[in-house]
């Protein structure tokens, strides 16, 4: 049986293009606005959505996503609240894959078995948990896959040939290549280096390889899309939402439209790079 992720990548391949993967923080700046943004992403051209789980110590995230997480936590966002938003989204959209991205601690506190059962029931398609290495696969990776969800692993510029097989061993859904060394949103990737890295990973796996970190514009997305199976954009979208908020950090009438406008530009870039 194919999954929503399988179907999405197959559709994009049939169209001769990469997938656009968009990241936003659940509950930013409040749960209802966050749900409106989530609904708007596929309407504006996103193929896959990543929904961030807010956490108090997000070590891999840059200032934009850290600030988004703090806004979400201030608004009362929780793991169960995030699953409730996915459930409401899934009641209207049965085709767009939803990946939850975050850190292990909130899931551990929630309870792994309970979380996985609730995630499946809500309509989640996979997880990206950035602080669990392959050596800890028994903790979450293997139970996630046994529950029928994808467990997506990160590869980085420092993942060498000795380490790569371990990274890929229990990865499913797709491989997420982090195009820069550092935190999210911190630099523009070296597109030549990215192309070589994608080729190196593809030689080791049949899974789609998507590239993220540092992608800010439609032109950046087009450059990555020419060589990868997918392009992830996160900090730029979180920034667009943040700039639309009022002085008290609350959503305005233009908040959802601000995110949608950038997604349309990114989608146009990805489609312009169709091969």
From Swiss-Prot:
Domain of life per record: Bacteria
Enzyme Commission number(s): 4.2.1.20
Entry GO MF terms: tryptophan synthase activity
Pathways involved: Amino-acid biosynthesis; L-tryptophan biosynthesis; L-tryptophan from chorismate: step 5/5
Residues the record marks as active site: 50 (proton acceptor), 61 (proton acceptor)
Catalysis: reaction(s): (1S,2R)-1-C-(indol-3-yl)glycerol 3-phosphate + L-serine = D-glyceraldehyde 3-phosphate + L-tryptophan + H2O
Family according to the record: Belongs to the TrpA family.
Assembly: Tetramer of two alpha and two beta chains.
Protein name per its UniProtKB record: Tryptophan synthase alpha chain
Lineage: Bacteria, Pseudomonadati, Pseudomonadota, Alphaproteobacteria, Hyphomicrobiales
Gene designation per UniProt: trpA
């Amino acid at each position: 049986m194919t999954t929503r992720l399988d179907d999405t990548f197959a559709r994009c391949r049939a169209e001769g293009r990469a997938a656009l993967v968009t990241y936003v923080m659940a509950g930013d700046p409040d749960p209802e606005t966050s749900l409106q943004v989530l609904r708007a992403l596929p309407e504006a051209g996103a193929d896959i959505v990543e929904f961030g789980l807010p956490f108090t110590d997000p070590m891999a995230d840059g200032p934009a996503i850290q600030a988004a997480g703090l806004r979400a936590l201030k608004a009362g966002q929780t793991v169960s609240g995030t699953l409730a938003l996915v459930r409401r989204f899934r009641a209207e959209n049965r085709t767009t894959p939803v990946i939850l991205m975050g850190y292990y601690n909130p899931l551990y506190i929630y309870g792994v078995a309970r979380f996985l059962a609730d995630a499946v029931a809500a309509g989640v398609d996979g997880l990206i948990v950035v602080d669990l290495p392959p050596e800890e696969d028994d903790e979450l990776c293997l139970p996630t896959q046994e529950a029928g969800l994808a467990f997506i692993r990160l590869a980085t510029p420092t993942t060498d040939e000795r380490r790569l097989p371990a990274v890929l061993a229990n990865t499913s859904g797709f491989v997420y290549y982090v195009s820069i060394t550092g935190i999210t949103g911190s630099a523009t990737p070296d597109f030549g280096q990215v192309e070589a890295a994608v080729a190196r990973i593809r030689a080791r796996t049949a899974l789609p390889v998507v590239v993220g970190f540092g992608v800010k514009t439609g032109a950046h997305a087009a450059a990555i899309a020419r060589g990868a199976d997918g392009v992830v954009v996160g900090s730029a979208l979180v920034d667009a939402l943040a700039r639309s908020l009022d002085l008290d950090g609350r959503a305005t009438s233009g908040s959802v439209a601000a995110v949608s406008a950038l997604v349309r530009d990114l989608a146009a870039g990805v489609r312009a790079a169709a091969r």
